[in-house]
Design a protein with these regions (language model features):
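Extracytoplasmic small-molecule ligand-binding "clamshell" domains
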Residues: 29-111, 120
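Bilobed "Venus flytrap"/periplasmic-binding protein-like clamshell domains
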Residues: 51-53, 63-79, 113, 134-188, ...
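Extended ligand-binding regions for polar small-molecule ligands
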Residues: 70-80, 141, 156-157, 164, ...
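Ligand-binding clefts/hinges and TM-proximal coupling segments of bilobed small-molecule sensing domains
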Residues: 28-29, 86, 165-181, 252-281
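Periplasmic-binding protein-like
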Residues: 50, 130-136, 205-206, 213-254, ...
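Acidic, polar ligand-binding/catalytic clefts
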Residues: 74, 86-152, 227-229
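Alpha-to-beta junction loops
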Residues: 82-84, 102-110, 156, 194-203, ...
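A ligand-binding cleft/hinge motif common to bilobed small-molecule-binding domains
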Residues: 95-99, 112-121, 171-172, 199-232
């Protein structure tokens, strides 16, 4: 029998054309929005840390598009109508960028939490990341049988900074069998963990990533909870000079990436799969 190429009914072709045309129109609108609003015409200048750290940027090379914030930056740039070769990177310190005044970037990505105090000096975009709460523990606790399940976590010895929301969150998310041991600050919490006095503690994921890599010997992030289960979680925004007219264009791009699920997919890849931190349901 002769091979016959399957064909699409006319209504499918028409519908597909509408979808593609709509997507193209959205991209064109975003590009029109950004026109004349960047530091350098036709170029999007993005700042990151010096150096930039895993898993936000891999190998301190944001131009590789590898790492959560590097990938988000290029996704936002594309949604705003910029090609990869129209993106340029500069470096700043964390504190330097928060200060009021003129900036040498269009926006800065360094895990900046959106706060009312900071918004008095700079502008923030809509959030591109809502921080999940994560369980920090040690290799010894894992070897002793601690697992990323609610049943296992209930039996752990927990520690917490008495001055933070970690205590009510522990009660709400896990309801441990024993009351957590309370400390004056997170330094004391991590010291107690290293001394073997507690099995685990609850931190936002960015803090847990830092503590496991730099502070706690043999530190392990056992798992993370869905961000929507956290009360008033930290939200990261792109930092911009106060009054930057590009903000509306950036916000439109982030809204599009949120609605299409692209931001969630980037988060899943770089903050779950690559880090190996499972989600505790």
């Amino acid at each position: 029998m002769p091979n016959r190429r399957p064909f699409a009914p006319a209504w499918i072709v028409a519908a597909l054309g509408c979808v593609l045309g709509s997507h193209s129109a959205v991209a064109d609108n975003h590009a029109a929005c950004a026109a004349g609003k960047t530091l350098e015409d036709g170029v999007l200048t993005i700042a990151t840390g010096n150096p930039a750290f895993y898993p936000w940027v891999l190998n301190d090379a944001p131009e590789s598009k590898e790492g959560f914030e590097a990938a988000v930056a290029y996704a936002i740039a594309a949604a705003m109508g910029f090609e990869d070769n129209q993106v340029t990177w500069v470096r700043t310190s964390f504190d330097e960028a928060i200060q009021p005044g003129a900036k040498n970037f269009d926006f800065n990505m360094q895990q900046y939490s959106i706060t009312a105090e900071r918004e008095q000096m700079v502008d923030f975009s809509l959030p591109y990341y809502t921080s999940a709460m994560a369980v920090l523990t040690t290799e010894q606790a894992v070897a002793d049988g601690l697992e990323p399940t609610i049943a296992s976590l209930k039996g752990a010895i927990w520690g917490a900074d008495a001055n933070t929301t970690a205590v009510p969150m522990l009660s709400e998310m896990i309801a441990p069998d024993a009351d957590p041991l309370l400390y004056g600050d997170n330094v004391d919490v991590t010291a107690a963990m290293q001394a073997g006095q507690i099995d685990a503690a609850l931190f936002d994921l960015p803090t847990a990533l830092y503590l496991s890599a730099v502070v706690v010997n043999d530190g392990v992030i056992l798992g993370q909870f869905p961000a929507e289960r956290s009360e008033n979680p930290d939200q990261f925004g792109l930092l911009m000079e106060e009054g930057n007219p590009l903000k509306e264009c950036v916000d439109a791009a982030i809204t599009e990436l949120t609605e299409t699920g692209e931001l969630r997919a980037i988060e899943s890849r770089w903050l779950q799969q690559v880090t190996g931190v499972p989600v505790i349901e």
